[in-house]
Amino acid sequence: MFGVLNSNDHRAAVQQRNTPAFGRTSFELWTDNPTSNYRCETGGNGRDSGQNRVRRPMNAFMVWSRDQRRRVALENPQMQNSEISKQLGYQWKMLTEAEKWPFFEEAQRLQAMHREKYPDYKYRPRRKALPQKRDKLLPAASSSMLRRQVLVDEKWYPFTYRDSCSTAAHSRMEDQLSSSQPVNIANSLLQQEHHYSSTSFRDSPETLATHLSADPPFYPK
């Protein structure tokens, strides 16, 4: 026989199940998961975050512009960062070699410290995302067959052509469509259709016969 729990015992059991282990914080419970630890160290997406990435040592211009950029930004709050960079680049070019020399010395000192701290450091520029080609964006069609409709005597008739049809032949079709002889257009298009169909089914006579019998002849009114 199963014992019946009263309301107090049931409430205590629910609270104990929802309460973390005694003497342990929620941070300790969260770090029990190795996947969570890895995400925390790498920035959440499995890659090295910007904080863990070793930065290049500053050059002379960066040492000089570090304080100058802050000053220009305070004097011109509405100026964009790109405009500030252009202005600083122009000012740096206007400095003499004697004025630039202290910043070159500071840059050399920072580079020496960087080599001591990171002896195996190698500069790895970030790869720029290349735009995908248009042919890769479009899904590959299962068949290279294209269909169009031809207007003859105010009636639409389907017309099929394949990749074997050259651009010149297709342009001739367009010229024929613009002419004033709809009956001749229909006959020429049907002849080309049967020509390409017979070419594609040349290896199979039975299939060719079935294909030709399935298409009824066209008699213009």
Swiss-Prot record:
Keyword set includes RNA-binding: no
Annotated compartments: Nucleus speckle; Cytoplasm; Nucleus
One GO cellular component term: cytoplasm
PROSITE patterns per UniProt: HMG_BOX_2 (PS50118)
Keywords, in A-Z order: Activator, Calmodulin-binding, Cytoplasm, Differentiation, DNA-binding, Nucleus, Sexual differentiation, Transcription, Transcription regulation
Transmembrane segments: none
Cross-referenced Pfam families: HMG_box (PF00505)
InterPro entries per record: HMG_box_dom, HMG_box_dom_sf, SRY, SRY-related_HMG-box_TF-like
A Gene Ontology biological process term: cell differentiation
SUPFAM superfamilies from the UniProt entry: HMG-box
Source lineage: Eukaryota, Metazoa, Chordata, Craniata, Vertebrata
Region (Disordered): 194-221
Assembly notes: Interacts with CALM, EP300, HDAC3, KPNB1, ZNF208 isoform KRAB-O, PARP1, SLC9A3R2 and WT1. The interaction with EP300 modulates its DNA-binding activity. The interaction with KPNB1 is sensitive to dissociation by Ran in the GTP-bound form. Interaction with PARP1 impaired its DNA-binding activity.
Role, per record: Transcriptional regulator that controls a genetic switch in male development. It is necessary and sufficient for initiating male sex determination by directing the development of supporting cell precursors (pre-Sertoli cells) as Sertoli rather than granulosa cells. Involved in different aspects of gene regulation including promoter activation or repression. Binds to the DNA consensus sequence 5'-[AT]AACAA[AT]-3'. SRY HMG box recognizes DNA by partial intercalation in the minor groove and promotes DNA bending. Also involved in pre-mRNA splicing.
Record's protein name: Sex-determining region Y protein
